[in-house]
Amino acid sequence: MRDCSSLSSIQWRFHAPKAKSNAPFFYSVKVADGNYKVTVVLGSKKKAGKTVVRAESRRLMLDEVSTRKGEFKTYSFIVNKRSPYITDKKNVKIKAREKGYFTWDEKLTLEFTGAAPAVKSIKVEPAPAETTTVFLCGNSTVVDQFTEPYASWGQMITRWFGPEVAISNHAESGLTAGSFLASNRLDKVLAMMKKGDYVICEFGHNDQKEKYAGSGAWYNFSFNLKKFIDEVRKKGGNIIFVTPTQRRFFDQATHSKIQETHGDYPDAMRAVAKREDVPVIELHDMTRTFFETLGYENSKKSLVHYPANTYPNQPKALEDNTHFNPYGAYEVAKMVVMGMKQLNLPIVKYLRSDWKDYNPAQPDDFNQFVWYPSVNLDVTKPDGN
């Protein structure tokens, strides 16, 4: 690891790995909080390469890039790095499980994987001041999941934006709108954001489980959503709501229709959004279409459904109808991007050139989806269900 906390620019050059070595590897550099432009030159004089690049906690930055022996390709992207620090008297109240995440440490970490990762050089420099940052607020369906086989759309959407946009994912498993606020996570967002940045909020999964005086969709939940709106707009930011992803809960009679499990929470979010003129991405509707299109059995392919002993220390089958696997998260991220396009958000002009519009009624073939598992594995279900 290099210490470059007062970084202006640093560049690493590598000797190509041995021709027979295709193992994934990591590189980290100690930097201050902020956005960093990373430029990688992929390829090797010694071998053909197939390289996937991820950042921090499994954020997908580049899908597999193929290079012939002696061929080199250059790509740039923005990585957002943060720590729990807000002020000398205030920090984000992270959970014990988060303390091991790359998300909150003092380093910017890059992961190089794929069938044959090949890297010539990496350059890390502060991103231009005008870089637009999109801050994500939410729960386990949004968070940068640290371990396989779980994944969320927040760590996949990074793949679709070029070096003009940073994604800063502050979501965490098990959070409600209220606990997000109480743990100072919005305070951290506000401390990092500038005028014109975006804050995207998806809540509702865990909020419905709150059982105390004043809880409920139309009172406490709605009140907390209004807090997000007021604080973000006070700083000159743009706020967007995302209705919660559906759970895989089919009707018992025909196993063909998704049944509603979120009560009034999606409608409450829509009502607050309408009253306060907040744009809404209808992920609730798109994921319903997605699950119903895949069908009762194939929809399991998008979630953490795996037979016993698929992974080490997994004696029982995994049957999670809430949390996505990498394929499902990749598809949901495309739905969010389509929601941005439908809202005509200015940042969609920065989508990468290989973006193709997506229809959840015509999902990508899960049999064709390729994912190289990261080294961190934990089959323990994330907080929230």
Where are these regions (language model features)?
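Short, solvent-exposed loop/turn and secondary-structure capping segments
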Residues: S121, Q145-P149, F180-L181, K211-S215, ...
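Conserved catalytic region of serine esterases and O-acyltransferases that act on ester linkages
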Residues: G70-F72, N91-K93, F102, E148, ...
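Conserved SGNH/GDSL esterase-like catalytic core that processes O-acyl groups on lipids
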Residues: W104, A115-P117, A127-F135, T141-E231, ...
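Short, electropositive alpha-helical surface patch
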Residues: V189-M192, Q252-A268, E297-Y306
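Substrate-gating cap/lid alpha-helix
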Residues: F249-T287
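Structured segments of extracytoplasmic/periplasmic soluble domains
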Residues: G43, E56, D144, M156-W160, ...
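Solvent-exposed loop/turn segments at secondary-structure junctions
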Residues: S44-K46, S140-D144, E172-G178, H205-K209, ...
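Compositionally biased, intrinsically disordered or flexible polar/acidic segments
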Residues: M1-E148
